[in-house]
Amino acid sequence: MTTLTARPEAITFDPQQTALIVVDMQNAYATPGGYLDLAGFDVSTTRPVIANIQTAVTAARTAGMLIIWFQNGWDEQYVEAGGPGSPNYHKSNALKTMRNQPLLQGKLLAKGSWDYQLVDELVPQPGDIVLPKPRYSGFFNTPLDSILRSRGIRHLVFTGIATNVCVESTLRDGFFLEYFGVVLEDATHQAGPEFAQKAALFNIETFFGWVSDVETFCDALSSTSFARIA
C-alpha cells in the first residue's frame, strides 16, 4: 500500500488497484494554434504541465498502475457533439468558435485532426488505454466505469487539462460512483484565469477528493517500491 501526502489529509491506496488518468492532453488544449488558444484562452504556461505529466506517467507505470488517456472530441461531422437541442451545442466554446469563424469548421476537436491529437511529448504505451469522450466527463458515454470495475480499481489519480472543466467533471462523476479521486495540481492546468484553477482545487479538496503534487506522488510510489524490495 502507498500513503500519499495530500490535502486535506493523506490517502492510502494500492498502486495496482489505482489508475492514473490523463485528461485531454491534446493540441486543442495545450498547444498554441489549438482550440483553446484560438478561442482566446491562455495556453502559454502549459509546457511545465506536460513535463510534469510525463514524470507522473513514468512513475505510475513503473509502480504497475493502469494509465488511461482521454481525448475529447467528436466525429468529423460533429454528430456526436449534439445539435441545437443539446446544451453542449450552445456551451461548447469549440463549437461556438467554429460558428463565429467558419474557416475553422471541421478543424477543432474533430477526430483525426491535429487539434484532436495528443501532444507530441505524451505517447501512450502498450498496456495503456486510450478513450475518446464526447463530453466534459470521462464517465459519460464511455466504458470507463466498466473498465475500472472489472479491474478492481477504486482510486483515480488525475492529471490534464482543464482542471476546472473536464478534470473536475470526471472526478465529480467518479465521486458519485464511489471512486476516490486525487488531483496532482502541478500536472493540471485551467481554462481561464488562475482563480479558476484555485477554485477547482478548493472544490475538489473540500468536497470531492484530494489534492497532491507530482513530486509527492513520485516519492510515495518510490518509497512503496523500496519497501517491497526490502
Curated annotation (Swiss-Prot):
GO terms for biological process: nitrogen utilization; uracil catabolic process. GO terms for molecular function: hydrolase activity, acting on carbon-nitrogen (but not peptide) bonds, in linear amides. It comes from the Bacteria. Its EC number is 3.5.1.110. The active site is at D24, K133, C166. Keywords: Hydrolase. The keyword Hydrolase applies. Induction: Up-regulated by the nitrogen regulatory protein C (NtrC also called GlnG) and repressed by RutR. It holds the Pfam family Isochorismatase. It catalyses: (Z)-3-ureidoacrylate + H2O + H(+) = (Z)-3-aminoacrylate + NH4(+) + CO2; (Z)-3-ureidoacrylate + H2O = (Z)-3-aminoacrylate + carbamate + H(+); (Z)-2-methylureidoacrylate + H2O + H(+) = (Z)-2-methylaminoacrylate + NH4(+) + CO2. NCBIfam families: RutB. Belongs to the isochorismatase family. RutB subfamily. Hydrolyzes ureidoacrylate to form aminoacrylate and carbamate. The carbamate hydrolyzes spontaneously, thereby releasing one of the nitrogen atoms of the pyrimidine ring as ammonia and one of its carbon atoms as CO2. This is Ureidoacrylate amidohydrolase RutB. It comes from Escherichia coli O45:K1 (strain S88 / ExPEC). The lineage of its organism: Bacteria, Pseudomonadati, Pseudomonadota, Gammaproteobacteria, Enterobacterales. The gene is rutB.
